[in-house]
Structures are given as C-alpha cells and as structure tokens.
Amino acid sequence: MSRLQTRFAQLKEQNRAALVTFVTAGDPNYDTSLAILKGLPAAGADVIELGMPFTDPMADGPAIQLANIRALGAKQNLAKTLQMVREFREGNSDTPLVLMGYFNPIHHYGVPRFIADAKAAGVDGLIVVDMPPEHNSELCDPAQAAGIDFIRLTTPTTDDARLPKVLDGSSGFVYYVSVAGVTGAGAATLEHVEEAVARLRRHTDLPISIGFGIRTPEQAAAIARLADGVVVGSALIDHIASAESSEQAVDGVLSLCAALSEGVRKARVS
C-alpha cells in the first residue's frame, strides 16, 4: 500500500479523521519553511500538502497568494521544493507528503523529469488544480504509473453528471472544496458538508478530505466528525505572514497545528 493508503487505513482503524496541513514551500524562506515542514508531524499533522510556488495561483485566496510571493521572493523554485522533500524524508519515512500547485512549473521542469525526481524525493501524491481529467495523459497517468497518487478537487458546483469524470483516475483521497471560490474563504455550513460527503461516498470509496475555510480546532473537530480528512492551510500561513522572526513563524504554525490536531483527535470521542 502507498503511504497515503496506509495512513488513512490506520486512522480508520482508530476511528478518527486525518489532519491535513498545507504550507507553501519556501515561505518565508527555505530554512524556516523546512523547519516548519520537519516539525509538522510531531505537532499532529497526519498528511502534509506542500505548495509549489507559482506566479499566478488563481485558485488561491490572498493568504496563499502572498505566501507564493514571499517564497518566490526568497528564490524558491521547483528544484528547491523537491530538495526540501528529500531533506524532510531523511528524518521521516511514514508521513504522506503531497505536492499541490499548478501545471506551469511542472511543464517547465519537464514532466518525465519531474515525475522521476518527485518519486525519488519521496513525494506521495500530486494535486494540480488546473489539470482537468480531460488531460489525464499529460500528467495524471504517468504520475500514477510511477506510483504517485493523483488527487482531484471537487466543489459544490461539481454536479452528478461531471463528478464521475472528475473522479476518473483519482487516487489517494478526494479533496472536497467546501466553499466555491478561492482558498481561505468563509467556512461552509456543516449541513452542506454532510450532504456533500454523502453524495461523494455514492461515487467513490476513496477517503474524502474537506478543506477551505477551516481555521479553528472547533471547526476542525466539526468537520472531522463528517469526513475522513480535515485540510487547513490559510490559517497556518497567517502565522507565517504575521511572524516577526523565523522562530515565531515556526512556533506559531506548529502551535496551531497541535491545537487543530487535538480538536480532530477528540472529535469522535463520545
């Protein structure tokens, strides 16, 4: 089994959801970002999404757009992001790590080279928001052939006619964007999320992770009762943006991660 399959299976046995954390690689700089990345598992992150910085992150809200700007300003690129994964893997062989971003940097790096280097570095999955299933042959198929999961986003506007197509070729888990729009937007209602999860379960056996708008341990716990994974990104990145030092950035992110993890872990305890 892949690291993602193993982790979600373990958590199912424990009757709890995964805490999935998102940070942008190289934000605010390489060393601070690597320290955050290395600290996330001990702070309670079950799965890590690592953003690949890009100049035009159109699906992301202001917090992650600014994170991209900070990372690019610190000279982060795809090669350095893969190096960061390699350094993370030197001390962690079991936490699933997923790269998330846009196709443009991968295209410029070269798809075959990227897949080979990502696999060698220890990448477990990809979320590429601007690669619809109609283009599976360009990245999804070769990535999966190399043993890298390809995770799809679904949204409130993905109707029943479109959903099977979106899920075609998906692996690892399904990422449900609970608010239509950009990342970090307002939280969805629990009733809406519950209905969406039920609809997705009719179409797939993959674990379902919910993201966009989750900022507090209480919100994370509420989602953890309904879904297999709880994704938090913008709330963590806000701590990097407001930090006055590298130490403050690391401490702020890891402290919030620990609080979110506690919320997720207690969510299903009666």
Swiss-Prot record:
<dbReference type="InterPro" id="IPR013785">
    <property type="entry name" value="Aldolase_TIM"/>
</dbReference>
<comment type="pathway">
    <text>Amino-acid biosynthesis; L-tryptophan biosynthesis; L-tryptophan from chorismate: step 5/5.</text>
</comment>
<dbReference type="GO" id="GO:0005829">
    <property type="term" value="C:cytosol"/>
</dbReference>
<keyword id="KW-0456">Lyase</keyword>
<dbReference type="Pfam" id="PF00290">
    <property type="entry name" value="Trp_syntA"/>
</dbReference>
<keyword id="KW-0028">Amino-acid biosynthesis</keyword>
<dbReference type="InterPro" id="IPR002028">
    <property type="entry name" value="Trp_synthase_suA"/>
</dbReference>
<feature type="active site" description="Proton acceptor">
    <location>
        <position position="49"/>
    </location>
</feature>
<comment type="subunit">
    <text>Tetramer of two alpha and two beta chains.</text>
</comment>
<feature type="active site" description="Proton acceptor">
    <location>
        <position position="60"/>
    </location>
</feature>
<keyword id="KW-0822">Tryptophan biosynthesis</keyword>
<comment type="similarity">
    <text>Belongs to the TrpA family.</text>
</comment>
<dbReference type="InterPro" id="IPR018204">
    <property type="entry name" value="Trp_synthase_alpha_AS"/>
</dbReference>
<dbReference type="GO" id="GO:0004834">
    <property type="term" value="F:tryptophan synthase activity"/>
</dbReference>
<dbReference type="InterPro" id="IPR011060">
    <property type="entry name" value="RibuloseP-bd_barrel"/>
</dbReference>
<comment type="function">
    <text>The alpha subunit is responsible for the aldol cleavage of indoleglycerol phosphate to indole and glyceraldehyde 3-phosphate.</text>
</comment>
<protein>
    <recommendedName>
        <fullName>Tryptophan synthase alpha chain</fullName>
        <ecNumber>4.2.1.20</ecNumber>
    </recommendedName>
</protein>
<keyword id="KW-0057">Aromatic amino acid biosynthesis</keyword>
